[in-house]
């Protein structure tokens, strides 16, 4: 410094970890997979980010996991796809059994975006009301297509038993298309909060049945598209759609 020799060099360097972002197709489960668990694939995605579209082909089997998907870095124009390798939801079952607790969430998506879930069976079982899919904070561009999204029996009006819950933050471009949504206190519960909205929510060609309170409760939504859905209410205490 100041044209003099530096006799103390330990503070002259920095270090960090650099990893290449994910891109391309990866396998989960089965023989010689890229990832043995779905949770492992998500952890790598969160750590590395995605520099292009990523497809996680999930091989046939039952995966007993609880999935937490937080904010992830995904390149502009790219998406991350979780799908059955055979494109048959009966072949890939992601499940979790709950017997205690009041805020159980098998798949929790927090402040995340650009996700696709295709042709999967997502299922909770057990003796307490639980959610299969729970989105909160700001979530955008997330689609569930061709999935069986199956809650447990929940004879309660509690929102903690909603099969799918979108709450506590703005939601943009969330799509549910051609899914089977079953049981729970609500099939779908959307309530972003007093200061937020769900924008451009799409519900198309879904079969929603056996929810205890409402097939779909839709609150504070701008630009809603509800087309060709079938809602079956099994008791006189349950209703179809509430807005």
Which functions belong to the PLM regions below?
Residues 24, 52-54, 65, 72, ...:
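The right-handed parallel beta-helix/beta-solenoid scaffold, focusing on the short coil/turn
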Residues 113-124, 140-153, 170-185, 197-214, ...:
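Right-handed parallel beta-helix
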Residues 70, 96-108, 127-136, 155-168, ...:
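Extracellular beta-strand/beta-solenoid scaffold signature
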Residues 74-130, 151-159:
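Right-handed parallel beta-helix/beta-spiral solenoid domain characteristic of secreted/periplasmic
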Residues 57, 68, 81-83, 93-95, ...:
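Extracellular beta-strand solenoid repeats
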Residues 1-22:
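Extracellular/luminal regions of secreted and cell-surface proteins that mediate adhesion/ECM remodeling
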Residues 23-64, 68:
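Acidic Gly/Asp/Thr-rich repetitive segments characteristic of extracellular carbohydrate-active
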